[in-house]
Amino acid sequence: MGLSDGEWQLVLHVWGKVEADLAGHGQDVLIRLFKAHPETLEKFDKFKHIKSEDEMKGSEDLKKHGBTVLTALGGILKKKGHHEAEIKPLAQSHATKHKIPIKYLEFISEAIIHVLZSKHPSBFGADVZGAMKRALELFRNDIAAKYKELGFQG
């Protein structure tokens, strides 16, 4: 279920807006994730003590991790579906070290969509949203396939 060239262009155009402030977008994505799905916070030893949104907004560690997450995702998106080399180590660490269920990747995908809608409404119409959702689904499906190869039932 790949994306067309036009869909990838839409995804990468809006991703250019994200790259202008990776740390800020990443922090917003993680805050959205943790607010919508508080159980996900337990997977982050560095952050699980943080309870309030104000604490999250003031956390440099959270901001740095948001930057790391979106930098990695941007590298994957730029491969336009040809991301085997990027997916393999990510799946390995998320399955064996962090034990992140696929469901949590769905949750963070929802958070990404929400943040893009709120920060870039004029650049995130239905066509762009649809393309981004498909790109994130492709990413999740490929991570899930690697999880299966690794014997992780996440």
From Swiss-Prot:
CDD domains: Mb. One of its GO terms (molecular function) is oxygen binding. Gene3D superfamilies: 6.10.140.2100, 6.10.140.2110. Pfam families: Globin. GO terms for biological process: removal of superoxide radicals. Monomeric heme protein which primary function is to store oxygen and facilitate its diffusion within muscle tissues. Reversibly binds oxygen through a pentacoordinated heme iron and enables its timely and efficient release as needed during periods of heightened demand. Depending on the oxidative conditions of tissues and cells, and in addition to its ability to bind oxygen, it also has a nitrite reductase activity whereby it regulates the production of bioactive nitric oxide. Belongs to the globin family. This is Myoglobin. It comes from Ondatra zibethicus. The gene is MB.
